[in-house]
From Swiss-Prot:
Organism in which the protein naturally occurs: Rhodococcus jostii (strain RHA1)
Disordered: region residues: 1-20, 31-78, 166-188
Biased composition (Low complexity): 7-16
PANTHER family: UPF0232 PROTEIN SCO3875 (PTHR36456:SF1)
InterPro entries referenced in this protein's UniProt entry, alphabetically: DciA-like, UPF0232_actinobac
Protein name as it appears in the record: UPF0232 protein RHA1_ro03670
Protein family (similarity comment): Belongs to the UPF0232 family.
């Protein structure tokens, strides 16, 4: 018996089923990586930063962190807020708030007992002293106070100080008034 069958042409390749969803994305990624590799570029392997679910599961499987510091250890709240402030560009405002809010820790209890900050605008810190003598003393200590502030919050936050003494008492009553004859001898 002979084969009377004619050799047939190879069967046409069956059409590929339509690819959808995640399979389509995978194929596109593989093609892009192959094209990059063919052109001699470095081929990325996706995220390796350790922020996804896989990295979290891998960390859980890793076990105890050991005696050294680890990124899983509790972090101070201040470090977190500083990172957020830097990330969002709030650092200058936070530094200004630190000078005004933590005045006692920044300059020391001695100075803080006799002077208080009243405002900070354009790098000029306004300080009100409780007496004229303390205002004079603070003016002489101005460079040391600026050094303490720079050490606490950084250079450039406070460039100079405007130190004022107490204001004189006023006998003015109400918003409308007539100029009087002066204070006269009211102290006996």
């Amino acid at each position: 018996m002979t084969d009377d069958l004619e050799p047939t042409a190879p069967a046409a390749a069956a059409p590929e089923p339509e690819v959808k969803g995640i399979d389509l994305a995978r194929r596109a990624l593989e093609e892009a990586r192959a094209a990059a590799k063919a052109s001699g570029k470095s081929v990325g392997q996706g995220r390796r930063s350790g922020t996804g679910v896989r990295a979290l599961r891998a960390r859980r499987r890793r076990g105890w962190s050991g005696p050294g510091p680890d990124d899983r250890d509790p972090q101070p709240f201040g470090a977190l807020t500083n990172a957020i402030a830097k990330q969002r560009g709030w650092s200058p405002k936070v530094s200004e708030g630190t000078v005004l809010g933590r005045w006692v820790q920044v300059v020391g209890e001695d100075i803080a007992a006799h002077a208080e900050p009243t405002g900070l605008r354009d790098g000029i810190l306004s300080v009100s002293a409780e007496s004229t003598a303390w205002a004079t003393q603070l003016r002489m200590m101005q460079s040391q106070i600026l050094a303490k502030i720079a050490a606490a919050v950084g250079d450039g936050v406070v460039k100079s100080l405007r130190i004022t003494g107490p204001t004189a008492p006023s006998w003015r009553k109400g918003e409308r008034h007539i100029r009087g004859r002066g204070p006269r001898d009211t102290y006996g």
